[in-house]
From Swiss-Prot:
This is 1-deoxy-D-xylulose 5-phosphate reductoisomerase. One of its GO terms (biological process) is isopentenyl diphosphate biosynthetic process, methylerythritol 4-phosphate pathway involved in terpenoid biosynthetic process. It comes from the Bacteria. Signal peptide: none annotated. Its EC number is 1.1.1.267. GO terms for molecular function: 1-deoxy-D-xylulose-5-phosphate reductoisomerase activity; manganese ion binding; NADPH binding. Belongs to the DXR family. 1-deoxy-D-xylulose 5-phosphate binds at K125, S149, E150, S174, H197, S210, N215, K216, E219. Mn(2+) binds at D148, E150, E219. NCBIfam families: Dxr. Pathway: Isoprenoid biosynthesis; isopentenyl diphosphate biosynthesis via DXP pathway; isopentenyl diphosphate from 1-deoxy-D-xylulose 5-phosphate: step 1/6. It catalyses: 2-C-methyl-D-erythritol 4-phosphate + NADP(+) = 1-deoxy-D-xylulose 5-phosphate + NADPH + H(+). NADPH binds at T7, G8, S9, I10, A33, N124, E126, G203.
Amino acid sequence: MVILGSTGSIGTQAIDVVLRNPGRFKVVALSAAGGAVELLAEQAVALGVHTVAVADPAAEEAAARGPGGQGAGRPLPRVLAGPDAATELAAAECHSVLNGITGSIGLAPTLAALRAGRVLVLANKESLIVGGPLVKAVAQPGQIVPVDSEHAALFQALAGGARAEVRKLVVTASGGPFRNRTREQLAAVTPADALAHPTWAMGPVVTINSATLVNKGLEVIEAHLLYDVPFDRIEVVVHPQSVVHSMVEFVDGSTMAQASPPDMRMPIALGLGWPDRVPDAAPGCDWTKAATWEFFPLDNEAFPAVELAREVGTLGGTAPAVFNAANEECVDAFLKGALPFTGIVDTVAKVVAEHGTPQSGTSLTVEDVLHAESWARARARELAAG
């Protein structure tokens, strides 16, 4: 397999799964942005990979030197550098590609892996969301295995019946660290507050997206694209314990739920090993201890991101790309103190509204997506700057 984004949250946990299962998996290449070159080099030596890629050309020499500049006495891997390096790796000779890159820059590697016939273990939800029609046009049935805990849960629960028997998908959300706050209270949230997620350990962008529930909105769009279920049959409920990762309700009134303690190694291992399960991938539920699982309706007034995502997903075309790109810029502005917490989604909504009728249909191209993203980023920066 190839692991893209190996130094990030998903990538490091995937490597943990690989190292704890010697003989089961073989990693042949790694890629990273280039900000954690020492870690990338250490991973390369530990896994014995033959190729690494860094998006930042300035990191090429450091990556080639290996950990501590020495390479630990092993042959150093081949180093690819530049913005297209991960895309080149995605089409390399292998069985599967784990796309753990954060953001829409993961679109090109996603398309490259699918076109090359690789099994795509997808953690980079943004590539599916911004390039939905493009990705679906090249993906073969069963070629995409989702790694998001929610979509991995739906993936498993959907096996409980025929697709025609599905009444609705129920996507759970922890609610983030601010689930009981009003919109007025949310206006005072600081970056430090928002980066402290109560359940999951994630990178900064995903952590902020979880706090605003933009992440849940993206997951609703992703569920629609992965499973061809209409938006009006995809429900979001708040589940603070994050043990039930999602549910499928069938036409006879029965509901299939996937439950496990919050540990991303579980869905990662499922994706890496599919169609087989990896023994002891993560601890299971302790059924000998009393526990309470709570479910609450989502407060759409305080957290409008999910409803905005539904609107964007329904529009389709380039609208999801605009939504995602504007959000990435607004998160950056919030972290720099240029936008209040509530200003993130408010500004994204303004950019989406200004975008108007999106480019859509069978004529959608990668260039259309990139152009829409570029415009959305520039407009979001303008609005954030006041």
